[in-house]
C-alpha cells in the first residue's frame, strides 16, 4: 500500500511537480476485489437500443431489404431524439396543469406539438391503436 499524503517524505530533488501540486494518489479503478481477495469479473455496461425493433419493422415493410450498422445507429439516434423531445414536452404539459403523472393525453398533445401536420395525425392514430390493443390484452 502506498503511503498517505501526510506520511510522504519531502523529495530531495528540489523540484516541485508541474502545476505546484503534489501528485494525486492513483486509485485502482477497474479492480474490484471480493472479501476473499479474488478479483471479481467486471460486468459490461448494458447499452439498450431500438435495433431489434427497427429490424422487425423493416422486415415487415420490406422483407428482402437489409440495413447497415451505420444506418441502424442513425435510426437509433433518431428514435432516442424523438423520445426525448416527446418526454420533455409531456413533462412540461404535466407541470403546466399541476399534475405529477404523464398520461397518454400529455403524450398525444406533445406529439401534436412536435411533429408536423400529417405525420402527427398518423402518429396519434398509431399510438391510440397501440394503447387500445394493450388495454384489451391486459384484461
From Swiss-Prot:
<keyword id="KW-0832">Ubl conjugation</keyword>
<comment type="subunit">
    <text>The nucleosome is a histone octamer containing two molecules each of H2A, H2B, H3 and H4 assembled in one H3-H4 heterotetramer and two H2A-H2B heterodimers. The octamer wraps approximately 147 bp of DNA.</text>
</comment>
<dbReference type="InterPro" id="IPR009072">
    <property type="entry name" value="Histone-fold"/>
</dbReference>
<feature type="modified residue" description="N6-acetyllysine; alternate">
    <location>
        <position position="8"/>
    </location>
</feature>
<feature type="cross-link" description="Glycyl lysine isopeptide (Lys-Gly) (interchain with G-Cter in ubiquitin)">
    <location>
        <position position="133"/>
    </location>
</feature>
<feature type="cross-link" description="Glycyl lysine isopeptide (Lys-Gly) (interchain with G-Cter in SUMO); alternate">
    <location>
        <position position="9"/>
    </location>
</feature>
<comment type="similarity">
    <text>Belongs to the histone H2B family.</text>
</comment>
<dbReference type="GO" id="GO:0000786">
    <property type="term" value="C:nucleosome"/>
</dbReference>
<feature type="cross-link" description="Glycyl lysine isopeptide (Lys-Gly) (interchain with G-Cter in SUMO)">
    <location>
        <position position="27"/>
    </location>
</feature>
<feature type="modified residue" description="N6-acetyllysine; alternate">
    <location>
        <position position="26"/>
    </location>
</feature>
<keyword id="KW-1017">Isopeptide bond</keyword>
<keyword id="KW-0539">Nucleus</keyword>
<dbReference type="GO" id="GO:0003677">
    <property type="term" value="F:DNA binding"/>
</dbReference>
<feature type="cross-link" description="Glycyl lysine isopeptide (Lys-Gly) (interchain with G-Cter in SUMO); alternate">
    <location>
        <position position="8"/>
    </location>
</feature>
<feature type="compositionally biased region" description="Low complexity">
    <location>
        <begin position="11"/>
        <end position="22"/>
    </location>
</feature>
<dbReference type="GO" id="GO:0030527">
    <property type="term" value="F:structural constituent of chromatin"/>
</dbReference>
<dbReference type="GO" id="GO:0046982">
    <property type="term" value="F:protein heterodimerization activity"/>
</dbReference>
<keyword id="KW-0238">DNA-binding</keyword>
<feature type="modified residue" description="N6-acetyllysine; alternate">
    <location>
        <position position="9"/>
    </location>
</feature>
<keyword id="KW-0544">Nucleosome core</keyword>
<feature type="region of interest" description="Disordered">
    <location>
        <begin position="1"/>
        <end position="47"/>
    </location>
</feature>
<feature type="cross-link" description="Glycyl lysine isopeptide (Lys-Gly) (interchain with G-Cter in SUMO); alternate">
    <location>
        <position position="26"/>
    </location>
</feature>
<feature type="compositionally biased region" description="Basic and acidic residues">
    <location>
        <begin position="1"/>
        <end position="10"/>
    </location>
</feature>
<protein>
    <recommendedName>
        <fullName>Histone H2B</fullName>
    </recommendedName>
</protein>
<dbReference type="Pfam" id="PF00125">
    <property type="entry name" value="Histone"/>
</dbReference>
<feature type="modified residue" description="N6-acetyllysine">
    <location>
        <position position="15"/>
    </location>
</feature>
<dbReference type="GO" id="GO:0005634">
    <property type="term" value="C:nucleus"/>
</dbReference>
<comment type="function">
    <text>Core component of nucleosome. Nucleosomes wrap and compact DNA into chromatin, limiting DNA accessibility to the cellular machineries which require DNA as a template. Histones thereby play a central role in transcription regulation, DNA repair, DNA replication and chromosomal stability. DNA accessibility is regulated via a complex set of post-translational modifications of histones, also called histone code, and nucleosome remodeling.</text>
</comment>
<dbReference type="InterPro" id="IPR055333">
    <property type="entry name" value="HISTONE_H2B_site"/>
</dbReference>
<dbReference type="InterPro" id="IPR000558">
    <property type="entry name" value="Histone_H2B"/>
</dbReference>
<keyword id="KW-0158">Chromosome</keyword>
<keyword id="KW-0007">Acetylation</keyword>
<dbReference type="InterPro" id="IPR007125">
    <property type="entry name" value="Histone_H2A/H2B/H3"/>
</dbReference>
Amino acid at each position: 500500500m502506498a503511503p498517505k499524503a501526510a506520511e510522504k517524505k519531502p523529495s530531495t530533488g528540489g523540484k516541485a511537480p508541474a502545476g505546484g501540486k503534489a501528485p494525486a494518489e492513483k486509485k485502482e479503478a477497474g479492480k474490484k476485489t471480493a472479501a476473499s481477495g479474488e478479483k471479481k469479473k467486471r460486468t459490461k455496461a448494458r447499452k439498450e437500443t431500438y435495433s431489434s425493433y427497427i429490424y422487425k419493422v423493416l422486415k415487415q415493410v420490406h422483407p428482402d431489404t437489409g440495413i447497415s450498422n451505420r444506418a441502424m445507429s442513425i435510426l437509433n439516434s433518431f428514435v432516442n431524439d424523438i423520445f426525448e423531445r416527446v418526454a420533455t414536452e409531456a413533462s412540461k404539459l404535466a407541470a403546466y396543469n399541476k399534475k405529477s403523472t404523464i398520461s397518454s393525453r400529455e403524450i398525444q398533445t406533445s406529439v401534436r406539438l412536435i411533429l408536423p401536420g400529417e405525420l402527427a395525425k398518423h402518429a396519434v392514430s398509431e399510438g391510440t391503436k397501440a394503447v387500445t390493443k394493450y388495454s384489451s390484452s391486459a384484461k
